[in-house]
Amino acid sequence: MTKFKLLLAGSLVAIVSMGLLASNINEREKERVALNKTAHSQGIEGKAMSEEWARYYPRQFDSWKKTKESDNITDMLKEKPALVVAWAGYPFSKDYNAPRGHYYALQDNINTLRTGAPVDGKTGPLPSACWTCKSPDVPRIIEQDGELEYFTGKWAKYGDEIVNTIGCYNCHDDKSAELKSKVPYLDRGLSAAGFKTFAESTHQEKRSLVCAQCHVEYYFKKTEWKDDKGVDKTAMVVTLPWSKGISTEQMEAYYDEINFADWTHGISKTPMLKAQHPDWELYKTGIHGQKGVSCADCHMPYTQEGAVKYSDHKVGNPLDNMDKSCMNCHRESEQKLKDIVKQKFERKEFLQDIAFDNIGKAHLETGKAMELGATDAELKEIRTHIRHAQWRADMAIAGHGSFFHAPEEVLRLLASGNEEAQKARIKLVKVLAKYGAIDYVAPDFETKEKAQKLAKVDMEAFIAEKLKFKQTLEQEWKKQAIAKGRLNPESLKGVDEKSSYYDKTKK
């Protein structure tokens, strides 16, 4: 009898356990189906607002919100004062920070001193193109107004429309959630370079190409056009300089051939190039790019929640999530891998400091030669060396992760940039000697303050103008966007606490 009772009890436990397991499996299957359920066939209303995607993709949305955790402001001009001299006469000499989480991308664009202090939609220093990589409202407006109209006018033109930070609609189709390129210039660039278009690419390739919508080198191409009313307009169209190839020297040759310059240097009067964020181009030269590892494999690794597998949308440093990002392929310890990365970074830092020290001194020595009477003809070759030196060195550092993505290429570019700067300085010795200044020593630029004084950057004035803008026009933009249903006010929480010139978290 006792044996029977034990057998019966055991059977009941097994039956209940199987029932619970079956129930759990069914619940997980429901979760999986719900997670993979696509949006409404007509698309998501309010598609530029990532909050509207949360009902279909709650896990992805919740993980995306965690990009808010990457909130540190690192003032790169304070860390590397030589950059101020390198960018004299250009907005980057005022303000340049290391990137934060995508949660802050749009607000950081609004806050930076580079975008100026417009008083209405027709004023300010920069074109509307400067919103392009910051918001899912950009593809919405391109669809709404047309590409050329979007690229026409000032940055402030769309201040009350471009109000949502980088999110779902930048990379996904709102009807199917499939990866999709949202900016026409990417396919034009890929075709010019001889690559497959986005649509022709494999899914694995698309997991990097959606990043290449923004993490690439580009310039603003002046484009004349007529609107529907026959009015002549000028658009500043984002263009990828890839028709000769995607290497640094091939892009350099492209720019030289069309005599393009982003600006004329404030000290040396050199026609300069500013590298943007060429992460994709440099990644393609590195071992991960060559082996077909995608950006998302490391920066958005797959994660498991019950029966559900999904891509972690907390885009960030893979070293913060090594068990999912690195250890699927690597067999070394986490600490050993971190030590390798640290070594790569230190080598980059060493060569960067040498290269930009020589570049800064070349600018200052050229400025001195001009002051003494040197002619443009005497300085032509010198300025070409400076232009190429800074372009190559800037390409090495403008993508903050390039030291890891392509360490050999980064060191090569910094060495090449340093060599070009030294060529300029050797020729400058002769020019300075001719004008009686053979003993000239360039002033030091060891701090941000010293460098900005040399670059004639009036920080107090720029900050005062910006703070006034933030108290006036920026507030109007947000009020209008909320009133018109373009912006969820919840998305503003904690987004504007810090910049390089204020910190509201400190009493």
Swiss-Prot record:
Name the chemical reaction catalysed here: 6 Fe(III)-[cytochrome c] + NH4(+) + 2 H2O = 6 Fe(II)-[cytochrome c] + nitrite + 8 H(+)
Binding sites annotated in the UniProt record for heme c 4: 295, 298-299, 405
Q: Which pathway or pathways does this protein act in?
A: Nitrogen metabolism; nitrate reduction (assimilation)
Job of this protein: Catalyzes the reduction of nitrite to ammonia, consuming six electrons in the process. Has very low activity toward hydroxylamine, and even lower activity toward sulfite. Sulfite reductase activity is maximal at neutral pH.
Which residues are noted in the entry as heme c 5-binding?
A: 288, 326, 329-330
A GO BP entry:
anaerobic electron transport chain
How the cofactor is bound: the record states: Binds 1 Ca(2+) ion per monomer. Binds 5 heme c groups covalently per monomer.
PROSITE patterns, per the entry:
MULTIHEME_CYTC (PS51008)
Indicate yes or no for the key word Ribonucleoprotein. no
Which InterPro entries does the annotation name? Answer: Cyt_c552, Cyt_c_NO2Rdtase_formate-dep, Multihaem_cyt_sf
Q: Which residues bind substrate?
A: 218, 277
What's a GO cellular component annotated to this UniProt protein?
Answer: outer membrane-bounded periplasmic space
**Would you identify the family this protein belongs to, as annotated?**
Belongs to the cytochrome c-552 family.
Which is one Pfam family of this protein?
Answer: Cytochrom_C552
Primary site of residence: periplasm
Q: Where in the cell is it found?
A: Periplasm
User: What is the organism of origin for this protein?
Assistant: Wolinella succinogenes (strain ATCC 29543 / DSM 1740 / CCUG 13145 / JCM 31913 / LMG 7466 / NCTC 11488 / FDC 602W)
Residues involved in Ca(2+) binding: 217-218, 274, 276
Q: What is this protein called?
A: Cytochrome c-552
